[in-house]
Amino acid sequence: MTTVTLVGTRLAEVGAEFVYRGEASGCEGCPYRDQCLNLTTGNRYRITNVRQSGQTLDCAVHENGVRAVEVEPAPIQANVPSKGAYAGSKASLPGPCPHTECPSHPYCEPAGAEFDEEYRISEIVGDPPHDYCMLDRDLTLVELEAPGE
């Protein structure tokens, strides 16, 4: 399902992904609030189209202004426990990891996913990018369905 929203001009490229963080303090009193604040806070989105007919609008948050784009919920790549991980099954993230230098850290704590939620696995990607887990977790890299799919 595609939604039209406004994003900063620097982000306004087809294929760009972002996690919607909600209203910023600079949004108060903005005439474009309804077009800008129409996504679900915490969800990851992918830009599918940049509206070429639209103009760049002034924005108190984005210094170069905002553009109209079409977005859809984006899937999330994440590490989940290997046991029971197969396409179509449900999984939760294994929990926080303090090892931020690990190549798997962005997949163990992916932006746009919460630890206390269950997600449906759409695809098994394969082995995680790390050689071994410093928390001794047996993990598999998967693609989680976008919320609302």
From Swiss-Prot:
Q: Which Pfam families match?
A: UPF0179 (PF03684)
User: What HAMAP family does the record point to?
Assistant: UPF0179
Q: Which family does it belong to?
A: Belongs to the UPF0179 family.
Q: Which InterPro entries match?
A: UPF0179
For this protein, the record's PANTHER family field holds: UPF0179 PROTEIN MJ1627
Q: Which organism is it from?
A: Haloarcula marismortui (strain ATCC 43049 / DSM 3752 / JCM 8966 / VKM B-1809) (Halobacterium marismortui)
Name of the featured protein: UPF0179 protein rrnAC1064
